[in-house]
Amino acid sequence: KYPSHGERFTGEPAYFRHVRMASERLFADTDTLARDYTWAVFHQPNGKFPAAIAAKLGFTLEQTAPGLLAPRIGNTYSGAVLLGLCNILDAASPGDTIFLCGYGSGAGADAFSMTVTKNILGYDRSDAEKLETRLADTTEVDYATYAKYRGKLVMGGGE
């Protein structure tokens, strides 16, 4: 029902090792540093891991905040980096540079460098709501309702 981690191959030790290595490799291959990017987004199993690795690599809160969604919406697993990228692209301008680093539990990490082109101006962004608008349109539920929908509470047969 819940994801489990395979000791040293997943979870905290692996996340920081793989994400750091992939990020540093991209920096070396592209002759860049964190300060050279407008935005950055990392895999987000929680809010702490990406914030910590971003700081260790030299990224600022201004660079990472728009792409850091896990503290607000939880762990979206493989969708985390892409949702962060969507939020960044909603505000991106031509010339902005974007650093992305995804991570797969125990399988490693991949880092990418992107540059927003002038072509972004040609897209009619009014066709779809911005991600921030969707995230603001929430319905809060109490714990009992949440537990019911998640199958944590099972109603008895009255026996």
What function would you assign to each model-found segment?
Residues 1-21, 71-79, 83:
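Active-site pocket-shaping loop/turn-to-helix segments
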Residues 1-4, 31, 63:
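A generic structural signal for ordered alpha-helices
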Residues 7-19, 32, 41-49:
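Short, contiguous, pocket-lining structural segments
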Residues 8, 17-20, 25, 35, ...:
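Arginine residue identity/basic-tract feature
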Residues 20-38, 57, 91-92:
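Phosphate/pyrophosphate-binding loops at sites that engage ATP/ADP/AMP, CoA/4′-phosphopantetheine
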Residues 39-159:
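Claisen-condensing/thiolase-fold acyl-transfer catalytic domains that form or cleave C-C bonds
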